[in-house]
From Swiss-Prot:
Pathway: Secondary metabolite biosynthesis; flavonoid biosynthesis. Transmembrane segments: none annotated. This is Chalcone synthase 4. The active site is at C165. The gene is CHS4. Its EC number is 2.3.1.74. The lineage of its organism: Eukaryota, Viridiplantae, Streptophyta, Embryophyta, Tracheophyta. The primary product of this enzyme is 4,2',4',6'-tetrahydroxychalcone (also termed naringenin-chalcone or chalcone) which can under specific conditions spontaneously isomerize into naringenin. It holds the Pfam family Chal_sti_synt_N. It comes from Bromheadia finlaysoniana (Orchid).
Amino acid sequence: MAPAMEEIRQAQRAEGPAAVLAIGTSTPPNALYQADYPDYYFRITKSEHLTELKEKFKRMCDKSMIKKRYMYLTEEILKENPNICAFMAPSLDARQDIVVTEVPKLAKEAAVRAIKEWGHPKSRITHLIFCTTSGIDMPGADYQLTRLLGLRPSVNRFMLYQQGCFAGGTVLRLAKDLAENNAGARVLVVCSEITAVTFRGPSESHLDSLVGQALFGDGAAAIIVGSDPDSATERPLFQLVSASQTILPESEGAIDGHLREIGLTFHLLKDVPGLISKNIQKCLLDAFKPLGVHDWNSIFWIAHPGGPAILDQVEIKLGLKAEKLAASRSVLAEYGNMSSACVLFILDEMRRRSAEAGQATTGEGLEWGVLFGFGPGLTVETIVLRSVPIAGAE
């Protein structure tokens, strides 16, 4: 009996490691340029009389290293919903009405692109992981996306709500476990974020809220994850070698988010960049010890760009060369902080710029890489990646 059970269990598992097989991204069409945003933001929220606060906000935007962001909320929508523009006005119903529809729709655009690149029928998708910090509903966004895409009713769904900015790592960790423990599994992973839950007017007494208004943008990213790829029809982009999560010491309350009648509020209560840079070396040592890697400039980097200060302090603390965080900085500049979707956008940017530069691998010509998610807790997700050779590269 026991040997038969062991054979069954072995047959249920994949032979090789999980790999990212395709990536797709999407944004709303409404682009907002950071240089113009302070004037727009204070006008649309009827806050132009707060001249000193507007100057502070301009400085925040100037230091953000963001060029543009995309937002579903247009001027027309905001004019129709004045409570969303006010500071701390009851507005959850209006916000929910937007996100329960628009979060799955934006997710669909990214998923369609990922499925197209993968090149297989969507009926082969066995699992769906959906992640958002933008609203909550039942049945969830995972159900809505299943219907929008026409996935099989028997697809195994997982819905992650309210995880925050580390969750791009969380979904990879979960997808890795699903792909490696279910032979033949093909996991569709989607992160979709819309700032309609967090947008609000300024207040002189809550500058941490203003920081979020300068940083956050909308976006959705989708990937297909599977083990034992078909060499004839599937092209792996990155292998998921290991995945771990940890809570940083003495970081309780560093980032808090609370869903209330006024929407989702974020509070930055401690030196977040300092806490991350102080602890990141240990995360790296724990993750790369089995591989014998100790030179952090010898690996490629995908780090959640919560803000420029996080990237700057990590770079200084580890003595990283400027180009190491180039892909992360590029996504921050072009899209802002899209919470859980950010690191998947950076994965896409990494493979794209590696190919365009004629690099030998999807990881800037290097073999090993790291993906970091940082968020409430403070929680850190650490994913060790292995790149794959780029066809035709010298």
